[in-house]
Amino acid sequence: MSKYADDLALALELAELADSITLDRFEASDLEVSSKPDMTPVSDADLATEEALREKIATARPADSILGEEFGGDVEFSGRQWIIDPIDGTKNYVRGVPVWATLIALLDNGKPVAGVISAPALARRWWASEGAGAWRTFNGSSPRKLSVSQVSKLDDASLSFSSLSGWAERDLRDQFVSLTDTTWRLRGYGDFFSYCLVAEGAVDIAAEPEVSLWDLAPLSILVTEAGGKFTSLAGVDGPHGGDAVATNGILHDETLDRLK
């Protein structure tokens, strides 16, 4: 049993709570949407979900700190810290696209040790904890243990991404397009879904040039517990780099080389 089994159990309870809010407000005619200072959208469901999760964590783990997308928090990454993205994929959420999820992770001295990704509109939930593997349920089915693919050549690989604009802003558009031209298949599954599909072995590479910690924390442990590799573009393990590359491990070094 994982050292963090009780924390994972709490994270799964948090996911249930989140689903009860987000799914109820999805496609609601009275959904309230506003713009944050960075001009990205935030809905009343984002705010209500993070508030509810913070309240439950504060009751269950009063000594733990919390960092969330909507209400901020401690960024020192010492001790035990919960990381929350109430709705990853808010732009999808507010347009009625079902590809969105609540992301919940526990960091121990900055390292993700437990994580849950819950996508109720897709009837899917993924989770992982240190040393206990990566798992997924679909439509309430029995949990299935996940393993990354064994694809060993880029020209046989499937790659998923979110957008091209970020690569251009990093002056890496040409390198990224060259990488995609090399791969067998390119799809824009986007956001959390790309990384979950890497963990499932359905996709071999996922990459983003600009992304926040709360977008990545549970995804990094999901991919690594499934046997994959998760780093920044600079090759640093974990979700703290501000960008991300996840692969089945076999393709990782070559992928990073192509993106330099």
Curated annotation (Swiss-Prot):
Entry-linked InterPro entries: His_9_proposed, Inositol_monoP_metal-BS, Inositol_monoP_superfamily, Inositol_monophosphatase-like
Function of the protein: Catalyzes the dephosphorylation of histidinol-phosphate to histidinol, the direct precursor of histidine.
E.C. numbers: 3.1.3.15
Binding residue positions for Mg(2+) 2: 85, 88, 215
Protein name per UniProt: Histidinol-phosphatase
Annotated positions binding Mg(2+) 1: 69, 85, 87
Sequence positions that bind substrate: 69, 87-90, 187, 215
Protein source organism: Corynebacterium glutamicum (strain ATCC 13032 / DSM 20300 / JCM 1318 / BCRC 11384 / CCUG 27702 / LMG 3730 / NBRC 12168 / NCIMB 10025 / NRRL B-2784 / 534)
Swiss-Prot/TrEMBL keywords: Amino-acid biosynthesis, Histidine biosynthesis, Hydrolase, Magnesium, Metal-binding
Transmembrane segments: none
GO BP term (any one): L-histidine biosynthetic process
Catalytic activity: L-histidinol phosphate + H2O = L-histidinol + phosphate
UniProt key word Lipid biosynthesis: no
Record GO terms (molecular function): histidinol-phosphatase activity; metal ion binding
Gene name of the encoded protein: hisN
Cofactors: Mg(2+)
Disruption phenotype: Cells lacking this gene exhibit an auxotrophy for histidine, but can grow on minimal medium supplemented with histidinol.
Organism domain of life: Bacteria
Pfam families in UniProt: Inositol_P
Family stated for the protein in its record: Belongs to the inositol monophosphatase superfamily.
Pathway: Amino-acid biosynthesis; L-histidine biosynthesis; L-histidine from 5-phospho-alpha-D-ribose 1-diphosphate: step 8/9
